Amino acid sequence: MELRLWFLFGLTVTSAAGPVPRPQPGDAGRSGVPRAPSATKETMAMVATRGPSPRSSGQEQEPGPFGELAAKGGPVRYRARRCTCFTYKDKECVYYCHLDIIWINTPERTVPYGLSNHRGSVRGRRSAGPSPQSSQPSRGTLRCACAESQDRACVYFCTRTLAARGASRTPETPDKEAGKPAGRATGGLHPRRLKSRTDKARRL
């Protein structure tokens, strides 16, 4: 029993110490000298060739319009929410308004991760639409509520309904084609009857 405990203790100590490096072919006679890993050497060489980082030299970068850093390679901060969608099922609206959203798709449901970080009460979140006293269109015609009323692009996006988007994507037909019967040009049925393979086999 005691022998087993000593054996387990020895295994624990050796596993905590880490693996012993193998001697390389050109290391004859230097087996007792500890070597730095090659990855550490490469990292030190890269830092030495790059020089000091821009932050350490005192050059502070200014955040961009939504909080991200405007210049190269700096850490990106969380951007402000541009607007609040009335329904999270409208994915285009969610991607437009919530700029830092990550969607977690599971077989059971699609969860918008990060939307619960909204600052404000739950009641305020539910009543994100315009108040009944306002002269703006009703909630049925709006997709979202903009954080800033001066943001024209956001106001345009939020007032554009799903039906209007669908109508704007379909091309309008000129008046000339309106009177033509449905045929090949307009995507109607082919005038000849298509024959199946069995019909062809009966002929033979």
Swiss-Prot record:
The record marks 103-104 as: Cleavage. GO terms for biological process: intracellular calcium ion homeostasis; positive regulation of smooth muscle contraction; regulation of systemic arterial blood pressure by endothelin; regulation of vasoconstriction; vein smooth muscle contraction. Residues 144-158 are annotated as: Endothelin-like. Residues 18-80, 104-204 form a propeptide. GO terms for molecular function: endothelin B receptor binding; hormone activity. PROSITE patterns: ENDOTHELIN (PS00270). SMART domains: END. It comes from the Eukaryota. Transmembrane segments: none annotated. It is found in: Secreted. Its main location: secreted. Keywords: Cleavage on pair of basic residues, Disulfide bond, Secreted, Signal, Vasoactive, Vasoconstrictor. Residues 1-17 form the signal peptide. Residues 127-140 have a biased composition (Low complexity). Disulfide bonds join 83-97, 85-93. Residues 18-71, 115-140, 166-204 are annotated as: Disordered. InterPro entries: Endothelin (IPR020475), Endothelin_toxin_CS (IPR019764), Endothln-like_toxin (IPR001928). PANTHER family: ENDOTHELIN, ENDOTHELIN-3. Belongs to the endothelin/sarafotoxin family. Endothelins are endothelium-derived vasoconstrictor peptides. This is Endothelin-3. It comes from Sus scrofa.
